[in-house]
Amino acid sequence: MVDLKTKAFDISQNFTISLDGPAASGKGTIGLILAKKFSLKYFQSSIVYRQLAFDCISQKIDVTDIDAVIALSKELKLDNNFDLENENIGNIASQIAVISEIRNNLNKYLISLVKTTPRMIMEGRDIGTVVAPDADLKIFITANPQIRAERRYKQLQAKGKTCILDEILRQIILRDKRDKERKAAPLLPASDALIIDTSKLSAMEVVEEVTNYIKNKIT
């Protein structure tokens, strides 16, 4: 049996990391650094939900028309021809993500992607519990909602986007509530996940903690 350290550092080995956590917890930045460090393909699972949200908007489908959205989810094609960080798209994506039929349809795509990619880190909300329960390493990132709102606010400001901190915080709290209370795969860490609170940690400090965990993990 190949140990975790060998899988992580030997690029000839298959190696899968699941990276879960709430919105604006720092998953994206951390995931990209880990992907580069361990030669992994990085995939943000929220893209499929945002793509579906964008398709609903562009095709003028009301997200309350559940049957229409479910039908659309069966025909999803990724083109990434939209602003991934658009808050309106993100909020719609969060609304449709609570529908179990939609999650099932989109998860089929994600599961297939994990199974056919030798070295991957997939980021999302239920990767370690649903999409890749057999991942070699499961990480769950969390942080205080206020800290997360401030981070998102700074990110948007740096890109020249107009935003209001209180509104970002309100949306984060609302999204957390949806994610945790949905019946289909609620936001929870896997029982064997490495849980890291990033409230007082930089992305590099988190990566260092993960690296040390890999080096010292006894299979």
UniProtKB/Swiss-Prot annotation:
Keywords: ATP-binding, Cytoplasm, Kinase, Nucleotide-binding, Transferase
One GO cellular component term noted in the UniProt record for this chain: cytoplasm
EC number in record: 2.7.4.25
Catalytic activity: CMP + ATP = CDP + ADP; dCMP + ATP = dCDP + ADP
Superkingdom per UniProt: Bacteria
Chain's gene name: cmk
One of the GO BP terms on file: pyrimidine nucleotide metabolic process
Organism for this UniProt entry: Rickettsia conorii (strain ATCC VR-613 / Malish 7)
GO molecular function, one term: ATP binding
Subcellular location, principal: cytoplasm
CDD domains: CMPK (cd02020)
UniProt xrefs under Gene3D superfamilies: P-loop containing nucleotide triphosphate hydrolases
InterPro entries recorded: Cytidylate_kin, Cytidylate_kinase_dom, P-loop_NTPase
Enzyme class: transferase
Family per similarity comment: Belongs to the cytidylate kinase family. Type 1 subfamily.
Protein name: Cytidylate kinase
Matches recorded under NCBIfam families: cmk
